[in-house]
């Protein structure tokens, strides 16, 4: 959580009365370590990924794929391997630049002439997900991957920090080590079901504290 100043700041600005919602167990334990009440509800962006919703996500490889890159976590070798892997395994590859320098980083890669670049805004990304029926999402942007699952798209998220791995430990999202290209290749070709394990009881418990109780 950081040093003494950070802990003091959190204890000052966060409520001692209410239970705080956290996205994973690690964040829950951090808040509890400074005597604040917390419950692990998962990220609110995941709350609609119920068993009924996930059952509608395709299990087989799509014809097309959306790729994102992370300009803040550059690895030319691994990212070039990923681009080559996707070009060899999908009929169409789309690149959606989300960060400020994502496009600049992507342009430094080789073998990208056949990749379709999507405008760097959420509306274009949403339009692509809605207009292409058979499309997977693969890459490092966690919330772009969750957004794809909200649109019922098969999703593979590659880790570049602890956020995706921490959430995956509790909620079973499809996360792979960035360097595990062999495992990713096998997963792309395999049939699997998306089974995000949302804790609806925790979500309901957190929401109920805000209900006005009648005397």
Regions found by a protein language model. Give the residues of each.
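Active-site anion-handling motifs in enzyme catalytic cores
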Residues: 1-215
